[in-house]
Amino acid sequence: MSAAEEVDGLGVVRPHYGSVLDNERLTAEEMDERRRQNVAYEYLCHLEEAKRWMEACLGEDLPPTTELEEGLRNGVYLAKLGNFFSPKVVSLKKIYDREQTRYKATGLHFRHTDNVIQWLNAMDEIGLPKIFYPETTDIYDRKNMPRCIYCIHALSLYLFKLGLAPQIQDLYGKVDFTEEEINNMKIELEKYGIQMPAFSKIGGILANELSVDEAALHAAVIAINEAIDRRVAADTFTALKNPNAMLVNLEEGLAPTYQDVLYQAKQDKMTNAKNRTENSDRERDVYEELLTQAEIQGNVNKVNTSSALANISLALEQGCAVTLLKALQSLALGLRGLQTQNSDWYMKQLQSDLQQKRQSGQTDPLQKEEVQAGVDAANSAAQQYQRRLAAVAAINAAIQKGIAEKTVLELMNPEAQLPQVYPFAADLYQKELATLQQQSPEHSLTHPELTVAVEMLSSVALINRALESGDMTTVWKQLSSSVTGLTNIEEENCQRYLDELMKLKAQAHAENNAFITWNDIQACVDHVNLVVHEEHERILAIGLINEALDEGDAQKTLQALQIPAAKLEGVLAEVAQHYQDTLIRAKREKAQETQDESAVLWLDEIQGGIWQSNKDTQEAQRFALGISAINEAVDSGDVGRTLSALRSPDVGLYGVIPECGETYQSDLAEAKKKRLAAGDNNSKWVKHWVKGGYHYYHNLETQAGGWAEPPDFVQNSVQLSREEIQSSISGVTAAYNREQLWLANEGLITKLQACCRGYLVRQEFRSRMNFLKKQIPAITCIQSQWRGYKQKKAYQDRLAYLHSHKDEVVKIQSLARMHQARKRYRDRLQYFRDHINDIIKIQAFIRANKARDDYKTLINAEDPPMIVVRKFVHLLDQSDQDFQEELDLMKMREEVITLIRSNQQLENDLNLMDIKIGLLVKNKITLQDVVSHSKKLTKKNKEQLSDMMMINKQKGGLKALSKEKREKLEAYQHLFYLLQTNPTYLAKLIFQMPQNKSTKFMDSVIFTLYNYASNQREEYLLLRLFQTALQEEIKSKVDQIQEIVTGNPTVIKMVVSFNRGARGQNALRQILAPVVKEIMDDKSLNIKTDPVDIYKSWVNQMESQTGEASKLPYDVTPEQALSHEEVKTRLDNSIRNMRAVTDKFLSAIVSSVDKIPYGMRFIAKVLKDSLHEKFPDAGEDELLKIIGNLLYYRYMNPAIVAPDAFDIIDLSAGGQLTTDQRRNLGSIAKMLQHAASNKMFLGDNAHLSIINEYLSQSYQKFRRFFQVACDVPELQDKFNVDEYSDLVTLTKPVIYISIGEIINTHTLLLDHQDAIAPEHNDPIHELLDDLGEVPTIESLIGESCGNSNDPNKEALAKTEVSLTLTNKFDVPGDENAEMDARTILLNTKRLIVDVIRFQPGETLTEILETPATNEQEAEHQRAMQRRAIRDAKTPDKMKKSKPMKEDNNLSLQEKKEKIQTGLKKLTELGTVDPKNRYQELINDIAKDIRNQRRYRQRRKAELVKLQQTYSALNSKATFYGEQVDYYKSYIKTCLDNLASKGKVSKKPREMKGKKSKKISLKYTAARLHEKGVLLEIEDLQANQFKNVIFEIGPTEEVGDFEVKAKFMGVQMETFMLHYQDLLQLQYEGVAVMKLFDRAKVNVNLLIFLLNKKFYGK
């Protein structure tokens, strides 16, 4: 039950807010409070009514009622409402922030007011009276939101009257609101002091706004209401037809329905009015209970619409298209886009829609919106059908022409509605479709035929492409697809199909055929199926052969072998028995090998057995004949014949030598005699035992043989067998060989005997030597005793001599000692004299060391003492060279800036000349069209001539030759230059977008903007962007230092991707390729560090080697695996191998720091500095680990893990890394990753803890590597770039960017301009204002506006244009510094330096308080005089200011007083602190001393750079000058050519060498007015134009014309007309200009006249 209407226990209705019960007595204040609550509740009801009505119109949910006002402020819902009832005025595309993403993110934006204005314009377009309109600020600033809700209510009633929207509900007393919601709304209304509009009087106000007699209208409406109350339909219809009621679309047949609907509407309104008035003391309005004119019209329209919809449903049931079309044309429906010829389409579409509605369980007829949607769909379908017919006709025509590219282009036409077409197979489509077209009776393919054919051919094309790329998965997918249309595809034959197709494709390539056709593929499939069938039949035949072998019947085996399906070759009937024996033997051997008694022979084994049997038969026949020939030769007694027979290879005898021929003959003859003596049985058969253990039977008479034993077989008793013959030969040959052996080795026997004798002699000699060696100690002892005796005797003799001369020895010793002492003294003295310079150096070193200590104190001390600072203040003095360099720098800077401005002026002149040349060329093209139509102009259409002159101006896109397009082009060039050179904008823009959009934006726009860093300038600018973006990301998005590692920072990802692409790929290849290749080439390397994996591979190896299942469990834990010694051994080997190869990678990486791209190292440095700045407490190791994460883990690690994916190595076609190689590289990468991050192996990897010490050592190497990698020069030093770089290049920077990217960038900048440039005076705001709104694709390309759903629009968006980037803003000049705290500080410091140089002291306070001595004052005075002399020589521009000169004239004491005054001011400003004796100033002076050297170096570098810049600018100025001269000559040539082709020059010259006279044209003003050239002359009537004559003549200067005006023959004025000025006016779009300040002429027609008369165009 609602809060507005409650029922108590007695069933009495309780009052609404603001009412008073009969037994309730309220004070005046309570009654006012109740009234305010009722107003708040009533307004909330109006909000709910507006919300529900808008939701019904928009089809989407709106914010809750209490939040509706805030939700309407951005105008999005209002603009969508405007699109609902007036789509022509409000386009969805023009609604700003349609999805409200910006509003939800950053709140209201001033551009949201555009949405409100569009809504107001839509209401104005449909004619809603403006009395209801709110102000924009009422909504945007929420100044009067009830006014907006009031307008929505009025709009709803107005739209209901027009039949464009449903009627708004009256929800007073029907909705619930909490006390809190009502009180909040009451407070809100009281806060703004808003007067609530009279919602109940909207109907009356709408009626009053009609342009009719108000009294008559109200009388007619009241009469209608009275008639409705009488409930007589005829009377009601009569009242409705009253002209004063202004009602339309009344149908007499619907009168009863009008009565019922209007009566019910009035009853509802009266009920609601009664509900309101009982609880309100406000003045009642007559229309609170009566239906208004708008409500009556709305209900009439509602009835008409229902009737029309019923007629449509009836027509759909009857199936009559004519009746349906008539029903659709009902004015009550107001359907758009009805076309008579599409009636059948309407019937088909609407019947389908109705059927779908019935199937979904809805029984009501189609609604108006559904009918309109059906009509639109039918129109679209009909249009598509016609386009499809045209497209099919174009396809057939293209096929007949035989141009494959044209055929494919037509097939790809979206209007043809064909399956996907692949351009690479153009020849295939052309060839096959042409064949189908010729086979067609009409020689034309229909759409269904084309659909099937294209579908099949596209599949064939994909099969061809997949075959070329080796993608067998795609080939099979297409083969098995029903779309391809192939028959008899068997899945089990998949691989066979693929193999055959590959062979077929290779054969086609060999025959220079690019594609295999559908027929080829089908034939291939059929062939494979046939082969498979034959193979099946052959398998059955092989089974029959094995069964026959098992039966042991040779004849059955022969029959089985001769089965045609088996396709066995070489089967002979006479070898049947041997086939049986050979094959059954092979079968037994196979059973033994496989240990399978049921093993059968396979086809190749059977075929091999047949061939072997045939071979055995041939060999056996030749063998038998050979033995027979030997026996015959022996019988003949012919030695030569016997020897030849014995040596025959067929019998296989060995050891036969020609020298024993006679012996063989005699020995064999003797053997045969013995046999003959034993008896001859005269048998004709001989049995031979042949290879394989078989017997072969040979007939001596017929010389034939066989394997089967003949009947009644008896062995011949005379014939010698092979074994007997071989035995005889072996014996004879052996005897002969022994005899030859002794003869051949006679010399060896003699040599052997000599060796024996030599051995005996050597043995005797060794015995004697051994004896002597044993006696060596005795010999040595005798010799030593003799030598000792001789030496002892000589010593005793010398000692006796010295004892006899003792005094002489003492004297000699004293003289020697004196000489040595004197020599040492003289040597030392000479040493000092020789090294006097070195001594001086040592003393200087000691003094320098003291000075160095002072300097270190100055440099490193936080508070350097005054004594130290005083020693170095002289370094602050400016020498003559300093002044000269400053002067040179100032002059050079002035000259550079002057030259820059000069070059800019030259550049502007060049642009202007470029435009003029373009205008001349364009004018020529335009005139060709104009002249071709000029003869057709009549008096009625002469005004079209001007439009024809301007037609070219309307063509073309961004680079069209018009002032508007030129300004747009220049604005974009300025914008992209600013974005390129100022990285702050893009850096902030990246983080204003979601990550997925920012990544796409980076990939598409940013790299395009910087030309993918194709030269040094773009690389410098791109790295600046990376630097700024990374600093911005760390500043705004990184809260903890580890987020850089654990997260995926946008800039880091972008930098790594860019440097690991084409630019950094070669670097990675140089660093890693050698070691990666070495690892891959080492086939024996197998790194496994998982104990379980090692255990399993060990178990598998044992089982493979032994052939027996292992008794060890297969699933074990790492601890259980490590309990096996073999596992430990293998793990140790793997660890050693991994450590060795990891060391190679580590050495390659740390030694190649110079190979890493500079950009990568620079970003590493920026990352380190930025993190240190944000996290000052982070240690060096922590920062270096993050640098390692960037340089190793993100940059190098993926290339090690997958070297094939990053082109580190080259693999052959189809080649890939093995599993072992990938595992090895992965293990190495893991080791390096642990080393780079100083991460140890713990926990689950505790078995690898043995290498933790190695990891720690490796980390130290990595640490030094990361430190060195971050030590790179700054961007400016690396690329040698400054603010003048772009100004000295001859060619401006050019980027190539697509239209879509331009529009996307423009849109993003507009959406986020407040975020990326919060300052209002930021240059980017000016540039965006110059560009205005985001243009459409068509406007930038120059195409006409097409359908928004045009599929070609995406392709148009990819159209690339080149933009020559230019800077709109000048080089900023120097600004004068103001006298502030810094000025006081500088002056005070300068005075302190002067004082402390001449007066020592411990602190500044002590010096200031101690009076200076006369000597100090005198020394100071002399120094100031020297400074004055030097200053006198200084140029004026570098002379010091007057206060500085005055300070030089002060004494030391006066300077001290001035210093004290300055110190007081600085103390007041908080700059210095007297408590620490002004140490801040001393520190500043020390800092100035330290920076003085750096400043001099920078000054020299800047001077050199400016000199280079000046030289380059001079070159550029020379280039521009040459260009200007060339352009001028070109323009002059163009004008000369124009003049030379004119009519004046076409006249023949009367005599050679005589100049032709220049002809002037004379026209009356009336004639020029008739031509449209002259528009008017101020203060002169048109009938006086005949008295005015204009004379136009060329001057000496080409392109200039002199125009003279005469009135009634009197010379009035002369005007100089410049042809180029006319073209410039045309370019700027100026259509009218003045001559003589009075005559207005049409510029375009004047140009046409000059061209026609003087330039012959």
Swiss-Prot record:
Gene Ontology terms: biological process: caveola assembly; cellular response to calcium ion; cellular response to epidermal growth factor stimulus; cellular response to fibroblast growth factor stimulus; cellular response to platelet-derived growth factor stimulus; epidermal growth factor receptor signaling pathway; fibroblast growth factor receptor signaling pathway; fibroblast migration
Classification via SUPFAM superfamilies: Calponin-homology domain, CH-domain, GTPase activation domain, GAP, P-loop containing nucleoside triphosphate hydrolases, RGC domain-like
Residue numbers of Phosphotyrosine PTMs: 172
Domain IQ: 745-774, 775-804, 805-834, 835-864
Domain of life: Eukaryota
Compartments in which it is found: Cell membrane; Nucleus; Cytoplasm; Cytoplasm, Cell cortex
Gene: Iqgap1
Higher taxonomy: Eukaryota, Metazoa, Chordata, Craniata, Vertebrata
Tissue-by-tissue expression: Expressed in the kidney (at protein level).
Residues annotated as domain Calponin-homology (CH): 44-159
Domain WW: 685-710
Organism field: Mus musculus (Mouse)
Name used for this protein in its record: Ras GTPase-activating-like protein IQGAP1
N-acetylserine modification, residue list: 2
Function statement: Plays a crucial role in regulating the dynamics and assembly of the actin cytoskeleton. Recruited to the cell cortex by interaction with ILK which allows it to cooperate with its effector DIAPH1 to locally stabilize microtubules and allow stable insertion of caveolae into the plasma membrane. Binds to activated CDC42 but does not stimulate its GTPase activity. Associates with calmodulin. May promote neurite outgrowth. May play a possible role in cell cycle regulation by contributing to cell cycle progression after DNA replication arrest.
UniProt domain comment: Regions C1 and C2 can either interact with nucleotide-free CDC42, or interact together.
